[in-house]
């Protein structure tokens, strides 16, 4: 089953909602990076949130980048997404040791750390990208995105993200939701929503119970008449290619390329996002030098 996001409204369009099932997408990322359980959870949550934020973008070629740096042993989390919800990403230390808060509950906050910030960069096709930052609250990622929305975009939001890891370290389930109130929301609706959010079990419990994205939408916004507006098929997609790496080599300068030619028979470059390896022999490197 492919990963999917639904965009919906509720309460006479005074609430907007995004609900994601990203199980296959996050499993693909785990396969590329061979992440430990806690790294899978942290990366999976960030991929899920960024994918939902991607479909919030208006333009076809607009991009979003999310960077989380909490100073923890996991290192930096970096995720890039497009306006169709497709994402790619990596963590600084994919094999970081996993610890639990309690049995079955990974301590994502300890791995990520909370001494740092979340940065969101939106490339909207303008001269300069939009850059927003917010301090990390817990390193658990869901709370940190909610803080970002409130502090940087002045948008009150409920954010829930979760990744279930199987005993063989594969991704059993992954998903999340972002619920946002719009300026026309009535006080009674807001109070009802706040009460409902406060009563909810975690997103991982919902997924363990077998709920899909539509079930979760109806469960979270029960009694608020949710209506699905659009459905997106999303995936972990890396757009790396030989031409991009050739450009990267050219950008480091003639001297560096000469040193590579002198030192090695073959130069190996690895994509951070998908771990695909690219090899350049001396003749290819010399060809790049000749083009410069």
UniProtKB/Swiss-Prot annotation:
Keywords for the protein's UniProt record, in alphabetical order: Chaperone, Cytoplasm, Disulfide bond, Redox-active center, Zinc
Disulfide bonds: 238-240, 271-274
Family according to the record: Belongs to the HSP33 family.
Organism: Alkaliphilus metalliredigens (strain QYMF)
Protein's UniProt keywords contain Acyltransferase: no
Predominant subcellular localization, coarse grouping: cytoplasm
GO biological process: protein refolding
Gene that this sequence comes from: hslO
UniProt-listed PANTHER family: 33 KDA CHAPERONIN
Entry GO MF terms: protein folding chaperone; unfolded protein binding
Top-rank taxon: Bacteria
PTM comment text: Under oxidizing conditions two disulfide bonds are formed involving the reactive cysteines. Under reducing conditions zinc is bound to the reactive cysteines and the protein is inactive.
CDD domains noted in UniProt: Hsp33
Listed InterPro entries: Heat_shock_Hsp33 (IPR000397), Heat_shock_Hsp33_C (IPR016154), Heat_shock_Hsp33_N (IPR016153)
Role noted for this protein: Redox regulated molecular chaperone. Protects both thermally unfolding and oxidatively damaged proteins from irreversible aggregation. Plays an important role in the bacterial defense system toward oxidative stress.
The protein's name in its UniProt record: 33 kDa chaperonin
A cellular component annotation (GO) from this entry: cytoplasm
Cellular localization per UniProt: Cytoplasm
SUPFAM superfamilies the record matches: Hsp33 domain, HSP33 redox switch-like
HAMAP family according to UniProt: HslO
């Amino acid at each position: 089953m492919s990963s999917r996001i639904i965009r919906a409204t509720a309460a006479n369009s005074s609430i907007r909602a995004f609900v994601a099932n990203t199980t296959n997408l996050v499993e693909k990322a785990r396969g590329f990076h061979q992440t430990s359980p806690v790294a899978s959870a942290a990366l999976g949550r960030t991929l899920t949130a960024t994918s939902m934020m991607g479909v919030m973008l208006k333009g076809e070629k607009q991009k979003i980048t999310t960077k989380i740096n909490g100073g923890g042993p996991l290192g930096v989390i970096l995720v890039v997404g497009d306006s169709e919800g497709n994402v790619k990403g990596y963590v600084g230390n994919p094999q970081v040791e996993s610890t639990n808060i309690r049995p079955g509950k990974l301590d994502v906050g300890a791995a990520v750390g909370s001494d740092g910030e979340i940065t969101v960069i939106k490339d909207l096709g303008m001269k300069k990208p939009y850059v927003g930052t917010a301090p990390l609250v817990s390193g658990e990622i869901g709370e940190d995105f909610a803080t970002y929305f409130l502090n940087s975009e002045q948008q009150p939001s409920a954010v829930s993200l979760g990744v279930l890891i199987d005993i063989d370290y594969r991704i059993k389930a992954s998903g999340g939701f972002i619920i946002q109130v719009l300026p026309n929301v009535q006080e009674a609706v807001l109070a009802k929503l706040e009460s409902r959010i406060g009563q909810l079990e975690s997103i991982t419990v919902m997924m363990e119970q077998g709920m899909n994205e539509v079930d979760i939408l109806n469960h979270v916004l029960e009694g608020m008449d949710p209506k699905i507006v659009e459905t997106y098929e999303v995936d972990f997609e890396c757009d790396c290619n030989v031409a991009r790496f050739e450009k990267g080599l050219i950008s480091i300068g003639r001297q560096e390329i000469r040193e590579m030619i002198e030192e090695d028979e073959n130069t190996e470059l690895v994509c951070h996002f998908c771990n695909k390896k690219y090899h350049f022999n001396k003749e290819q490197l010399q060809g790049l030098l000749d083009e410069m």
